[in-house]
């Protein structure tokens, strides 16, 4: 993973296809993509999010994005995570490796204990990714994404404390 950079707008543009956004309400306008890119950069500067471009040895350009951001959920301060791996690079374990690395980053540098993911209940690939990456299914929830578009999601939770305890040396 590499920190989101000013030159990463094409990563979002390549993710903005009908196939890639079927569970996200469909493609965004060009202006919405530019706004999202600016938001990724701004949120990194403010410390409210950490967005990354995903690199793969099999491609010269980034193959997607992953990140986490601060969220208030069920009266707790948590992180939410999201990801996107370009169609040609799906099915090769890239998303699982990127999400695991993203979670480790949150554990190493973040100040919250839980990360949540909210894939639509019918998004079998993203739900399988959550399961495979070690998230626990907490239930279902009603969401709006994009705003004004109600969806039903699975509520997956990952406890960062497990990563923190395994990545720190044992005390004598």
List each language-model region with its residue ranges:
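Short, P/G- and charge-enriched loop/turn segments at secondary-structure junctions
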Residues: 39-42, 144
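Short loop/turn motifs at secondary-structure junctions and domain boundaries
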Residues: 42-48
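Acyl-donor (CoA/ACP) binding surface of acyl/acetyltransferases
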Residues: 1-18, 22, 51-172
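Conserved GNAT-fold acetyl-CoA-binding loop/helix
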Residues: 20-39, 50
